[in-house]
Amino acid sequence: MLDISLIMLGAGNSSRFELPVKKQWLRIGSDPLWLAATKNLSEFYTFKDIIVVSKECEYMARFAPHYKFVTGGDTRQQSLKNALNLVSSQFVLVSDIARPCITHELFSKIIEGSKQANCVVPALKIADTAYFGDEVIDRDKIKLIQTPQLSKTNLLKQALETDTLYTDDSSAMRAVGASVWHVLGDERAHKITTKSDLAKIPCLIPPSNEHFTGIGFDAHEFERGRELWLCGEKIEYEFGLKAHSDGDVALHALTDAILGAAGLGDIGELFPDTDAEFKGISSLLLLQEAYKKVQSVGFELVNADITIMAERPKISKFKRKMEANIAGALNLAPNRINVKATTTEKLGFVGRGEGIAVIASANLKYYDWTK
């Protein structure tokens, strides 16, 4: 049995994918795509190490703590070099998280090919006529290269010690004189690049219908000389709320609820009050940025409920406008947002009129990429 480690490349920004969710975070059942693709390959072989390359290592590690995670670079090649620093096995298998349907048949051909060369690469032939400029190319000489690719680790590390950028491992291996062996690829190993590719991937199943609830709470004291903002609405009052941002305590609680439902920490981690960039900033902008983050990892908001606790000022007449502000910022129907107001019956700092407290809940579901 060969000594092999697996590297899964998934640090791209999905710029060509054209959906609010990054492709690596599309849910296949309950698993994000990167995890589904990694599990698929790990069912075929007992790898020495499984290394996932990402820009979100800490968050990913919560899904698979038994894997190793490494931060990706600006290019595929730099990402691979970063991962290779953790590899000590004789061979390394490199694949993309965007190829979730690798078959056991293809995997076996790649492993068997290790007897033939230093690098084994799946490749497809083309059936269509091909041109380069105005010249017809002999299509029998054209190969469409796929992953996973199996290489001798020491040679691949050597091959990548260059400023020349390569788009796959075999190109780098050829450049240092390593032998390369092609095995017949598989159409089912198609790579997801744009959203139209999803229809070409046979093994994908729709996201599960699980829902996730988050709770957020925040409280601020009144401060004279500041504007009072609640749910993106300016309220005429003699006091505002003391804060680093605009002090919109309701949006802070809602932002925490949304982040919490996705397991993405809290508003203070994303927008620390020690950062001058966020001094006086609109909390609607912070909410939008937080929601983009939540969307990027595969969630969408179903509904949110906000309870504002204030002895004064009276805000009942502003509730519908507040709901519309939030719905507009998040591109949702207003009926998905509910704002309530209450007092604390003269109890506590709220009852004494010293400030405002808010509790919010948010309900998320997986983004449905099948629509």
From Swiss-Prot:
Keywords: Isoprene biosynthesis, Lyase, Metal-binding, Multifunctional enzyme, Nucleotidyltransferase, Transferase. The record marks R139, K191 as: Positions MEP for the nucleophilic attack. Pathway: Isoprenoid biosynthesis; isopentenyl diphosphate biosynthesis via DXP pathway; isopentenyl diphosphate from 1-deoxy-D-xylulose 5-phosphate: step 2/6; Isoprenoid biosynthesis; isopentenyl diphosphate biosynthesis via DXP pathway; isopentenyl diphosphate from 1-deoxy-D-xylulose 5-phosphate: step 4/6. One of its GO terms (molecular function) is 2-C-methyl-D-erythritol 2,4-cyclodiphosphate synthase activity. Its cofactor is a divalent metal cation. Gene3D superfamilies: 2-C-methyl-D-erythritol 2,4-cyclodiphosphate synthase (3.30.1330.50), Spore Coat Polysaccharide Biosynthesis Protein SpsA, Chain A (3.90.550.10). GO terms for biological process: isopentenyl diphosphate biosynthetic process, methylerythritol 4-phosphate pathway; terpenoid biosynthetic process. Residues 212-371 are annotated as: 2-C-methyl-D-erythritol 2,4-cyclodiphosphate synthase. It catalyses: 2-C-methyl-D-erythritol 4-phosphate + CTP + H(+) = 4-CDP-2-C-methyl-D-erythritol + diphosphate; 4-CDP-2-C-methyl-D-erythritol 2-phosphate = 2-C-methyl-D-erythritol 2,4-cyclic diphosphate + CMP. Transmembrane segments: none annotated. The record marks R16, K23, H244, T343 as: Transition state stabilizer. It comes from the Bacteria. Residues 1-212 are annotated as: 2-C-methyl-D-erythritol 4-phosphate cytidylyltransferase. NCBIfam families: ispD (TIGR00453), ispF (TIGR00151), PRK09382.1 (NF006899). In the N-terminal section; belongs to the IspD/TarI cytidylyltransferase family. IspD subfamily. In the C-terminal section; belongs to the IspF family. Bifunctional enzyme that catalyzes the formation of 4-diphosphocytidyl-2-C-methyl-D-erythritol from CTP and 2-C-methyl-D-erythritol 4-phosphate (MEP) (IspD), and catalyzes the conversion of 4-diphosphocytidyl-2-C-methyl-D-erythritol 2-phosphate (CDP-ME2P) to 2-C-methyl-D-erythritol 2,4-cyclodiphosphate (ME-CPP) with a corresponding release of cytidine 5-monophosphate (CMP) (IspF). This is Bifunctional enzyme IspD/IspF. The lineage of its organism: Bacteria, Pseudomonadati, Campylobacterota, Epsilonproteobacteria, Campylobacterales. The gene is ispDF.
